[in-house]
Swiss-Prot record:
ATP binds at K519. It is found in: Sarcoplasmic reticulum membrane. NCBIfam families: ATPase-IIA1_Ca, ATPase_P-type. Its main location: membrane. It comes from Artemia franciscana. The chain crosses the membrane at residues 60-78, 90-110, 263-282, 301-318, 776-799, 841-863, 899-917, 935-954. GO terms for cellular component: sarcoplasmic reticulum membrane. It catalyses: Ca(2+)(in) + ATP + H2O = Ca(2+)(out) + ADP + phosphate + H(+). This is Calcium-transporting ATPase sarcoplasmic/endoplasmic reticulum type. This magnesium-dependent enzyme catalyzes the hydrolysis of ATP coupled with the transport of the calcium. The active site is at D354. Belongs to the cation transport ATPase (P-type) (TC 3.A.3) family. It is a multi-pass membrane protein. Its EC number is 7.2.2.10.
């Protein structure tokens, strides 16, 4: 049934053909069960483990590595080996590659399994049982909630979880209050009624006659007819939205995917080229004159080239850097659930923030109040107007009047204000030892009045020597010695007030007999006020006094303050309780007559004190903050002015919309509104998702905050979903990040950390890529020039994973730039490598490759311990035979000597260490940013060199890597060949500082 909230309950009951007193007949129940299905959310069909594992290998770089491993394994199995050491070496390469791929897959599967929990977490809001009236049995019967069908008559009472979406048909108590915060984000429980809500487009917050599945009954008892079950409930539609939301890759993941595609194409071309260049050498004597053996030999070189070109250490280094970033964020109260989102934070351009609890404390607090000072006969009434500080439930704050700090106990009317706040109240504050914070017990507005009374402390009670909890309750405990509450007349919609009947326990200024203390909406209470309290006197109410009260109350409720106002009053001579019918709430208004007005208090959910600075930092960082709230527009605008989202006198036209106003716009109008607006008020969950969609369409990277079940679809859809630590399990499961302290300024700190991490990641990604270019150039040169192998695959794997991996990880500890939050966010499509940088790394890579090959050639041609070959002999080494006159007097076994390979590997490792020092800064000279500015990098370089010495000088390892120890003379040659890379990069950095080229190569 559409728009049940807009129809009379009798129409709804008729639609289902149900008698509200007897319920559905069994035939109707069966028919509806067949038609609508069970009242439960379908279980999530997760991907099988095999599917998840296979998905991890659906990546070009991974496929190339896998192919390289398989080919290496096949060659190792079928090739003849001279000795056991050579055979072991042949198997090391495929084994290590497979180990890397398996580790990568395990991490990926674990992350995906975690992400699937969001939809399952919704199940916790499904109630297990429901109380139903059905024609087959008399009275109320308890059944499983899953067996409820549309048309069932359900009874609910305090403490129950609503078992399905219901249309109220009768309220069986004075009032019915529902806590629907998980669904609508409202911070206070909502009073429900049975009257139609004539607006067919009403948002869930305004459907006061509807009860939603999964929400809780705070007070009262009622009956309703089931309107929706399973997926046809409000919570079911949220499940559908979450199910339909596709996971998006982060900007970095997209960049790396594109980089992988480009790299795979380049690798394919180079591998084919190397193989093709050497077709003429397939028949060389070294291959036994066999064309097939020669083809396989050069095929192995092509495989080695593929291994050299892929930065195998990159996934591990990125994961390590992100994991370290999450640890730093956790110290700032930002708990990251999804590793890739750490980097995404760095390019966040829009933060869509919930108001309640994120920008504000979600702890109602009285900030202003007034009482009468004097009412002269011939002049306007005079007021005492008080301002109070403190924005939490801890009763610490000061009282000011006209900017001057005062002692509230000096004013007689304050004693009466405090008495009404304390006695006409069913709530309290409690100290949570675990959180070391004060919390409300009961209603937020009533708790604010309790805190006000404790702050005012009108009898100057001493708090000395008391702990935090005891000091916060001194006024409450003192009040209990002065007054005894006999009964309460609960709040009702018709009179918009509540009252308590109290008797004095000891004599005092106010306690000269029983009194009724009244609080409620100003217009409702003032209509029943005949007098006004001025100090300790009672003055008759006049139209002028009434106008003054309404004028100041309106000022409190509008403009910058937009406070929620309550009028406080007393009845000095109440009716005898024997004459009151305290069961029938329709008569309460008769008992609350002849009131004496005492004062008005104005309260709000106050902004967090650190938010103003955080918003300013966002503005400096080029990040737009959009406030999205279920609260009304006026209140939201007032808070936005206080925290700096809007200026004090800024016109908000075109920059603030309600959900209804947004819906009324055309698609183009909605897009423009999202592009400009800074506030969306009175919105529903689907509005949040729609706003995220528009932002994504504009190329913005959005962070979305939320805490309720209703926020989960938008949290899942946004690039960064941010849940509150105090939020629901569903919101936390759907989010990438959880704020332990629910604080907006924590988001800004996390964005700063994200930017720093991205900058460092750029440095080590570029470092690793330039290293791989050097390795590719090295293999290409040896193959193209016909030189002996300078590096073999197992050595390349060692360099890529261990020797390069450690300094690359250490580059993640580079200190952040001081002006990191004074720059606009980077574009999501910004390239990892610009054209100029590509040229730089090609220049460095070419030097690395040439130096590596040169080191091996140096040993063959110029070393005192080498054979002293000429270039022709070196480049035609495969033609070496005892009969060949060009190789007369040369032992052909010399080409298998481990020395030249050791020289090449040592030069490669040393150059990479110097290259890591170059990567401390993209453009800054080492004279400005010396190596010791990152002590972790120095440690990593020392460790890498130590590991290199280990494989050189530990015999079993040197056998595996086919290398040997070097002499001091040979090490001096290694350093001479390696050192110029520092000078080369310094020259390139100097050119970059003078003439920067911004066009992007990898987009």
């Amino acid at each position: 049934m559409e728009d049940a909230h807009a129809k009379k309950w009798e129409e709804v009951v008729d639609y289902f053909g149900v008698d509200p007193e007897r319920g559905l007949a069994l035939e109707q129940v069966k028919k509806n069960q067949e038609k609508y299905g069970p009242n439960e959310l379908p279980a999530e069909e997760g991907k099988s483990l095999l599917t998840l594992i296979l998905e991890q290998f659906d990546d070009l770089l991974v496929k190339i590595l896998l192919l390289a491993a398989i080919i290496s394994l096949v060659l190792a199995l079928f090739e003849e080996h001279d000795d056991e050491a050579e055979q072991l070496t042949a198997y090391v390469e495929p084994f290590v590659i497979l180990l890397i791929l398996i580790a990568n897959a395990v991490v990926g599967v674990w992350q995906e399994k975690n992400a699937e929990s969001a939809i399952e977490a919704l199940k916790e809001y499904e109630p297990e049982m429901g109380k139903v009236i059905r024609a087959d049995k008399t009275g109320i019967q308890k059944i499983k909630a899953r067996d409820l069908v549309p048309g069932d008559i359900v009874e609910i009472s305090v403490g129950d979880k609503i078992p399905a979406d219901l249309r109220l048909i009768s309220i069986l108590s004075t009032t019915l209050r529902i806590d629907q915060s998980i669904l609508t984000g409202e911070s206070v429980s909502v009073i429900k009624h049975t009257d139609p809500v004539p607006d067919p487009r009403a948002v869930n917050q305004d459907k006061k006659n509807m009860l939603f599945s999964g929400t809780n009954v705070s007070a009262g008892k009622a009956r309703g007819v089931v309107m929706g079950t399973g997926l046809n409930t409000a919570i079911g539609s949220i499940r559908t939205q979450m199910f339909e939301t596709e996971e998006m890759k982060t900007p970095l993941q997209q960049k790396l995917d594109e980089f992988g595609e480009q790299l795979s194409k380049v690798i394919s071309v180079i591998c084919v080229a190397v193989w093709a260049i050497n077709i003429g050498h397939f028949n060389d004597p070294a291959h036994g004159g066999s064309w097939i053996k020669g083809a396989i030999y050069y095929f192995k070189i092509a495989v080695a080239l593929a291994v050299a070109a892929i930065p195998e250490g990159l996934p591990a280094v990125i994961t390590t850097c992100l994991a370290l970033g999450t640890r730093r964020m956790a110290k700032k109260n930002a708990i990251v659930r999804s590793l890739p989102s750490v980097e995404t934070l760095g390019c966040t351009s829009v933060i869509c923030s919930d108001k309640t609890g994120t920008l504000t404390t979600n702890q109602m607090s009285v900030s202003r109040m007034f009482v009468f000072k004097d009412i002269p006969d011939d002049a306007a009434p005079e007021l005492y107007q008080f301002e109070l500080t403190g924005s939490t439930y801890e009763p610490i704050g000061e009282t000011f009047m006209q900017g001057q700090k005062i002692n509230a106990a000096d004013y007689d009317a304050v004693k009466e204000i405090t008495t009404i706040c304390m006695m006409c109240n069913d709530s309290a504050i409690d100290f949570n030892e675990y959180k070391q914070a004060f919390e409300k017990v009961g209603e937020a507005t009533e708790t604010a009045l309790i805190v006000l009374g404790e702050k005012l402390n009108p009898y100057n009670l001493s708090k000395a020597g008391k702990d935090r909890r005891s000091a916060a309750l001194v006024v409450r405990e003192d009040m209990d010695t002065r007054w005894k509450k006999e009964f309460t007349l609960e709040f009702s919609r018709d009179r918009k007030s509540m009252s308590s009947y109290c008797v004095p326990l000891k004599a005092g200024l106010l306690s000269n007999g029983p009194k009724m203390f009244v609080k409620g909406a100003p217009e409702g209470v003032l209509d029943r006020c005949t007098h006004v309290r001025v100090g300790t006197k009672k003055v008759p109410m006049t139209p002028a006094i009434m106008d003054k009260i309404l004028e100041v109350t309106r000022a409190y409720g509008t403009g910058r303050d937009t406070l929620r106002c309550l009028a406080l009053a007393t009845i000095d001579d109440p009716m005898d309780p024997k004459d009151m019918d305290i069961i029938d709430s329709t008569k309460f208004v008769k008992y609350e007559q002849n009131c004496t007005f005492v004062g008005v208090v104005g309260m709000l959910d106050p902004p967090r004190k650190e938010v103003l600075d955080a918003i300013e930092r966002c503005r400096a960082a080029g990040i737009r903050v959009i406030v999205i709230t279920g609260d009304n527009k006026a209140t939201a605008e007032a808070i936005c002015r206080r925290i700096g989202v809007f200026g004090e006198d800024e016109n908000t036209e075109g920059m603030a919309y309600t959900g209804r106003e947004f819906d009324d716009l055309s698609v183009e109008g909605q897009r423009d509104a999202v592009a400009r607006s800074r506030l969306f008020a009175r919105v529903e969950p689907f509005h949040k998702s729609k706003i995220v969609e528009y932002l994504q369409g504009m190329g913005e990277i959005s962070a979305m905050t939320g805490d309720g079940v209703n926020d989960a679809p938008a949290l899942k859809k946004a690039e960064i979903g941010i849940a509150m630590g105090s939020g629901t399990a569903v919101a936390k499961s759907a989010a990438e990040m959880v704020l332990a302290d629910d604080n907006f300024s924590t988001i800004v700190a996390a964005v700063e950390e994200g930017r720093a991490i991205y900058n460092n990641m750029k440095q080590f990604i570029r470092y690793l890529i330039s290293s791989n270019i050097g390795e590719v150039v090295s293999i290409f040169l040896t193959a193209a020039l016909g030189l002996p192998e300078a590096l073999i695959p197992v050595q390349l794997l060692w360099v890529n994973l261990v020797t390069d991996g450690l300094p690359a990880t250490a580059l993640g500890f580079n200190p952040p730039d001081l002006d990191i939050m004074n720059k606009p966010p980077r574009r999501a499509d910004e390239g990892l490598i610009t054209g100029w940088l590509f040229f730089r790394y090609m220049a460095i890579g070419t030097y690395v490759g040439a130096a590596t090959v040169g080191a091996a050639a140096h040993w063959f041609m110029m070393s005192p311990t080498g054979p002293g070959l000429n270039f022709y002999q070196l480049s035609h080494h495969l033609q070496c035979t005892p009969e060949n006159e060009y190789f007369e007097g040369i032992d052909c076994e010399i080409f298998s000597d481990p020395h030249p390979m050791t020289m090449a590997l040592s030069v490669l490792v040393t150059i990479e260490m110097l290259n890591a020092i170059n990567s401390l800064s993209e453009n800054q000279s080492l004279l400005v940013m010396p190596p010791w500015s990152n002590i972790w990098l120095i440690s990593a370089i020392c460790l890498s060199m130590t590991l290199h010495f280990v494989i050189l000088y530990v015999e079993i390892l040197s056998t595996v890597f086919q290398i040997c120890p070097l002499t001091l003379t040979e090490w001096i040659v290694v350093l001479k060949i390696s050192f110029p890379v520092l000078l080369l990069d310094e020259v390139l950095k100097f050119v970059a500082r003078k003439y920067t080229d911004e066009f992007s190569f990898i987009k």
